[in-house]
Amino acid sequence: MMKQLLFITFMLTGGVCLAQQQPIEVAEGFSISIKTSAICEMCKEAIEYDLAYEKGVKSSDLDLENKVVTVVYNPKKTDPQTIRERITKVGYHADDLYREQDAYDNLPFCCKDGAHDTPIPQVPLKAGEGN
């Protein structure tokens, strides 16, 4: 019984992961969710701005909590692979595609890996300062 329950759980989890990779038809066109390496509002703005200029992309919305961008597009004008490649050219990972290093190097500091994990250095005050 326990093995069956475990098997069913793995199958459902695998199905959900696979479903995220497949385009879903919506009223405006097709929709796909792409995992990114975005970490802040500037990342969100950069990705959504750049995707707005990709031919065939109708809309995009990046959820920073999950680091997933949902893109609605016209399949006659673009495809998921082209959209992923566009994201990598901005400097971010897109599903299994690695970001372009030159683009990453030009990102603001807050958009780079570990930028939000680094504590702000404290400068010691000299005697008599700060009062």
For every predicted segment, state its role.
Residues 104-128:
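Short, low-order "capping/linker" segments at domain edges
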Residues 21-23, 127-131:
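Short acidic DE-rich linear segments
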Residues 11-13, 34-37, 104-105:
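Processing junctions and N-termini across compartments
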Residues 47-63:
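Short acidic amphipathic segments
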Residues 38-46:
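Conserved redox-active cysteine motifs that mediate thiol-disulfide chemistry
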Residues 59-105:
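Mid-chain, structured segments of secreted extracytoplasmic proteins
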Residues 26-38:
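Short glycine-/aliphatic-rich beta-strand segments at the starts of folded cytosolic domains
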Residues 1-26:
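Bacterial Sec-dependent N-terminal signal peptides
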